[in-house]
Amino acid sequence: MSAGDARISAFDHGFLYGMGLFETFRTYGGRPYLLERHLRRLAEGCRELRIRYEPDAERLEALIRRTAEANGLPGDAYVRLTVSAGDGGLGLPAGDYEEPQELVMVKPLPAAAPGLYERGRELRLLRTPRNTPELATRLKSLHYMNCIAAKRELADTDAAPGAEGLMLTADGRLAEGIVSNLFFVADGEVRTPSLDTGILPGITRERVLELAQAAGHPVREGRWSWEALLEADEVWTTNSVQELVPVTTLAGLDGEPAHPRAGRAAGPVVRELLAQYREDAGSRPSADT
C-alpha cells in the first residue's frame, strides 16, 4: 500500500508508550543481507518486551521484495521493518501483547558523499551521553529520544556535512555513534567497545568482528577513553546501511581538531574489511547460514 494509506491505531502501545522494535538493513541486488540475524535480534527483543511475534524469514523476504519492486527499487534499497506492540488501550499492561503490528518500509539508499569510503568523514565528540539501557541488553526499540538529542546536538555544531556524532557512557568511556557502532585499530588489534558499555549489539558490528578474525586480525572488545581513540592508527564506524565508513577527522567537544595517525585517507585495515564485507554481501544468500 502507499504510505498515505497506512494506518496505526491511536491506542497502539508503540505510539503511546514506545513499546516496539525495528530493524534497519539494506538489500544487495534485491536480497536482504544478513536477514536471519536481523530477524533473530528482533525476535529476541520481542520476547523481552513480551510481544508475541515470531518472524518468518521466507514470508518477510517475499514481502520486502514486493515492497521494493512497488517502489521501483528491485536492486539495492534501504529497508526498515518495524514491529509495534499493537492496540492495548490506555494504561500500562500486565500481560503479553498478542496482536502486534508489522510494517515494512522501503526507500532508496541515501547517497554517499563523493569519496566517503576513500577520504572518510569527521567523528565529533558529543556532550550527550549514551543513556543506560532499560534492560540487560540494549534493544533497537522505538525509544529513540537519546539518539535524537545527540543528532540535534551534532546539527548545532560546525561539524562537516555528513559527520557522525560520538556518545560516551556516563562514566566517560567510548560508546557508539548516533546511528553506528565504533571500531579502531591500536597496538595491532581491531578494537570495539564491549556490549557492557550499553551499546547496541549491531549486526554489522558482529559481522565485522567475524571478518576481522577470519583475516587474522586480533580483535578485542573493551572499555576505552576518548584519549585512546586519539592515539588510534585507524578509526571507522559501522551500520547496516552505510557499511564500514572510515573516520579521518576526530573533533572534540568544542570542535578542536585531532587526527588519527592514519591521516586523511582510509587505512589499510578498514579498506580490507570493507572489501570483504561487500564481497560477502554480494555473494551470500539472503537467508544467512
Question: PLM features: what roles do these ranges have?
Answer:
Residues 165, 173-195, 201:
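Glycine- and Gly-Pro-enriched alpha-helical subdomains that act as flexible
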Residues 197, 208:
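Catalytic subdomain that performs nucleotidyl-dependent activation
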Residues 202-207:
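Feature captures the catalytic cores and cofactor-binding loops of soluble hydro-lyases/lyases
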Residues 125, 200-201:
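Short beta-strand/loop turn elements enriched in aromatics
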